[in-house]
Amino acid sequence: MTVVDAHGGTIARSELEQWLKPRWDGLTDATRDRNDRGLVNQALQAASGLGLIETSRDTVELAVPSLPVDISGFADLVHSLLLAQADQSSDADILDAFACAVVETELRANRQWLSDRTAAQIADLFTRSLKPRAIETADQRYNTSRHATWMRWVEFVGLNQSIAPRTTLLSVTDRLHRALRASDLPRDEAIVPDAMLAWVASTLPYLDKGTLFLAAAKRMGHVPGTSISRLLSAALRDLHEDGVIRLVAPRGDAQVVAKLASDTFADIHAFNAVILNGSALDA
């Protein structure tokens, strides 16, 4: 992307391939060329599939008006493009599978369940749970090789956290933080839970009451309860503890409007307002 941008937004495909070729020390020329072509084609296919570039036989052209200034901004751009994918595209499966993961987290009451299952078991689960396509192929929809790629994608856009080798903790804290920063929600004012949760559902549709979440829940036989999901509850608590937001806990006879998922070690279990800390959020 940066190479194409540096060339004015359009570059000859042959020239881009030269820029993208890595060094392969110790390999034969034939092996090096094979690796080069494979990696270049993978990069072009991924960028093209997301709508970042348009390719022809001879040229590659940027399909976005401008590039983000840093990797965090690029992750935000990729997340927005994934949300915009057509239902039947393979890239749409990335967030659809994450919605299934959110539902499975509710069913298992465990945010580390990905670490407890093999890639084959996870692939089988997602293949059964993803939204059916109009035309299915003979290939498994989600397989073990795609699982490794999926894990990298969701971590890149802020939906997953590797806390130790072979240990994965599903977490939406980073993505929620970024989404709040980019939002036009009022700062330093009380927001009622219904308004906050409606914003979450429309902005991050793989979470509570979002379209992807509700569709996945229906396919997987999960009936959402009255409490906020474990993933969203954990993210809200994290941001509250970091001072990015303030969850206003009900006092005395005040009405409890939103209940967080059960957590023995948590200090806050319910709230009746959310306040975004403008100075911390927009810093």
Language-model region placement:
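Donor-sugar nucleotide-binding helix/loop cap in glycosyltransferases
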Residues: 1-283
